[in-house]
Amino acid sequence: MPFYVLKLGGSLIGSANALMSALLNLSREDYCFLVIPGGGPMADLVRGLYDKGLLSDEAAHWMAILAMEQYAYLLADGTGAVLTTEISRSDGVKVLLPYRALQEDDTGMEHSWDYTSDSVAVLIASRLNSNLIKATDVDGIIIEGEVRKVVSATLLKGIRTCLDQGSIRLLKDRTC
């Protein structure tokens, strides 16, 4: 059965139910997904507090991870998707609650805004030796105003895009 780690960006919060429904339909055809939620507007609130100097890097990191958990509950709510705290390959559609797993082992991740939910998804896909799909409201990666479908992680290093710098460091020489 094909298995994918799917990072579902917070920018898609308005389409969450339709997207989860589509994933559940695909799971009936033996596709399996571990959905990694973005932080969405909840993480934006954390970033706003951080930008005002009200939070340390450490507190902001863990609060942003908890924001991902809030989005996970929204994604699973009424859709039939199952919430999980386990980082593992499994059948169907599971939505990860990442806090506990990352508290146990977040090796490779700095506690800074360079490492967001994108980095969490890359880290988990690497641990599971899985393909990673990053779903956002942008169809590709925007570099200097141009949408590119495929780029190397090396090209992205140091460029501000819709992919965080931590992900780029974790990807190293892979193609994304």
Locate the predicted segments by residue.
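A charged helix-plus-loop insertion that forms the helical arch/lid used to bind
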Residues: 47-67
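Short, active-site-adjacent cap segments at secondary-structure transitions
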Residues: 12-14, 41-44, 102-103, 139-142
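Short beta-strand segments
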Residues: 7-9, 36-37, 97-98, 135
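Active-site phosphate/oxyanion-binding loops
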Residues: 51-52, 86, 91-124, 129-176
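Ordered, amphipathic secondary-structure segments that act as subunit-interaction surfaces
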Residues: 65-89
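N-terminal glycine-/serine-/threonine-rich phosphate-binding loop
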Residues: 1-34
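Short beta-strand segments at enzyme active-site cores
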Residues: 34-45, 133-137
